[in-house]
């Protein structure tokens, strides 16, 4: 039987599931505490979500926004990282079951974020390209590039149009940003890389079910984003409910069809599920309901933060917080303090309840084109774009990466040139394939515990 292989010591153990922006911040803040910290993530690296779409359009290299956990936490005492998937929790036994065996905890924090929501549509789930992770973004990059290659050589005009149409479903920040990035690729890359192809044949459609883009931002930001995208040649359509995808066609409720082989679905998310936390504890979007201290009520030592949780105790956000990076980071910073107090035996009155401080929101649509809202201050265009760059560079982790990403962007800005338009697929050796297969079928929580040591 595999095991987590971490010795218990006299310190209380905090297990954190998920090394996104929230989980990472929590682990970092707890590293100097009097607790044993165990971080579990199914990847061995942290990925910086706001820039994932840049990989998809061959804008930056995946390694510029991915950071190995072991490197981040080098030389930390009482810190352990394990690459595994959380499967089930047994709150009464204080045990978390993972793909590599069980782990005991004193405190368990779920920070696993969200996954793409296909709303039960099997065809869309099978064919669409989601955009939540670095590997999905690389998949999209490969798809776009290999479709361009095929468009030069395919037999029929019909197939050529399918290969050159890109359909993006979902007009939130990700949809807007990827539409902008792909339209820049169409304008500045294709004429040079593919001189024998008519780039005007490439069409980018952005379909939104509602009546505006960036629903989380103000009306003027939505309007500006729409103007920017249409000026860049993106075909933005509102009131469009996508119902299915068949025979390389996106089908809509109103009967409209768009032929495409590059079909992106960024239309919604749902919280990562975990066995052992039943429906009574879940709110909308499958989010785990928590109290003002991010505790899961009625479950001793269990917490959830970030996109995965729904907290309605914040007076300014009675319906719960928006699923944004800042919420996760702020909740993590406060929970780190509260957990240390709880470990020392504090009562509720000694803990600080969470209040979200909205630092503003931003989206970038292309070079010189962004929308930024910081409180009463709204900006659109070049200044907003510079602000967007600064904010995202500041929050990126490693020093080397900040420099790399900045040089990359500056070079792109000056030259529109780009060296990462390679179609590369990672192959998995048989040993690794077999191991992954084994891990997918073991430790599902059903083999429970009684018969293990």
Predicted regions and their residues:
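FAD-binding core/adjacent interface of flavoenzyme oxidoreductases
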Residues: 1-15, 79-167, 264
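Beta1-alpha1 glycine-rich phosphate/pyrophosphate-binding loop at the start
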Residues: 3-80, 173-216, 264, 453
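C-terminal, flexible cofactor-proximal segment of oxidoreductases
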Residues: 11, 337-453
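Short glycine-rich anion-binding loops that position phosphate/pyrophosphate groups of nucleotides
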Residues: 22, 113-116, 179, 269-271
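An active-site-proximal "capping" alpha-helix that borders the catalytic cofactor pocket
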Residues: 37, 324-343, 362
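A Rossmann-like FAD-binding core segment of flavoenzymes
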Residues: 77-90, 183-292, 296-298
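FAD-site-proximal beta/loop scaffold in flavoenzymes
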Residues: 126-156, 248-251, 257-330
């Amino acid at each position: 039987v595999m095991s987590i292989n971490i010795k218990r010591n006299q310190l209380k153990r905090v297990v954190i599931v998920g090394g996104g922006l929230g989980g990472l911040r929590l682990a970092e803040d707890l590293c100097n505490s009097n607790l044993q910290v165990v971080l579990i993530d199914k990847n061995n690296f942290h990925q910086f979500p706001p820039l994932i779409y840049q990989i998809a359009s061959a804008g930056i290299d995946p390694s510029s926004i991915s950071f190995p956990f072991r490197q981040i936490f080098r030389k930390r005492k009482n810190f352990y990282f394990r690459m595994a998937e959380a499967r089930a929790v047994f709150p009464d036994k204080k045990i978390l079951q993972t793909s590599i065996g069980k782990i005991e905890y004193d405190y368990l924090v779920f920070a696993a974020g969200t996954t793409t929501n296909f709303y039960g549509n099997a065809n869309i789930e099978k064919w669409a390209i989601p955009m939540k992770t670095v590997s999905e973004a690389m998949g999209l990059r490969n798809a776009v590039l290999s479709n361009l290659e095929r468009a030069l050589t395919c037999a029929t005009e019909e197939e050529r149009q399918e290969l050159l149409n890109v359909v993006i479903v979902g007009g939130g920040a990700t949809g807007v940003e990827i539409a902008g990035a792909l339209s820049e690729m169409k304008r500045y890359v294709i004429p040079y890389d593919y001189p024998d192809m008519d780039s005007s044949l490439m069409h980018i459609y952005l379909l939104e079910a509602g009546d505006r883009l960036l629903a989380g931002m103000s009306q003027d930001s939505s309007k500006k984003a729409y103007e920017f995208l249409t000026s860049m040649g993106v075909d933005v359509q509102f009131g469009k409910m996508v119902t299915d995808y068949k025979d390389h066609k996106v089908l809509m409720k109103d009967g409209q069809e768009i032929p495409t082989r590059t079909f992106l679905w960024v239309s919604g998310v749902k919280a990562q599920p975990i066995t052992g936390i039943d429906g009574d504890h879940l709110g909308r979007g499958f989010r785990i309901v928590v109290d003002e201290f991010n505790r899961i009520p009625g479950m001793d030592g269990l917490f959830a933060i970030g996109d995965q949780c729904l907290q309605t105790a914040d007076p300014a956000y009675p319906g719960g917080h928006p699923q944004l990076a800042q919420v996760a980071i702020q909740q993590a910073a406060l929970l780190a303090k509260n957990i240390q107090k709880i470990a020392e035996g504090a009562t509720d009155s000694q803990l600080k309840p969470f209040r979200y401080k909205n630092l503003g929101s931003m989206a970038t649509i292309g070079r010189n084109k962004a929308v930024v809202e910081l409180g009463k201050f709204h900006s659109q265009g070049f200044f907003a774009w510079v602000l967007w760059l600064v904010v995202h560079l500041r929050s990126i982790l490693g020093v080397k990466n900040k420099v790399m990403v900045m040089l990359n962007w500056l070079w792109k800005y000056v030259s529109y040139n780009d060296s990462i338009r390679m179609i590369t697929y990672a192959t998995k050796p048989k040993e690794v394939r077999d191991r992954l297969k084994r891990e997918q079928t073991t430790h599902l929580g059903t083999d429970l515990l009684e018969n293990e040591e």
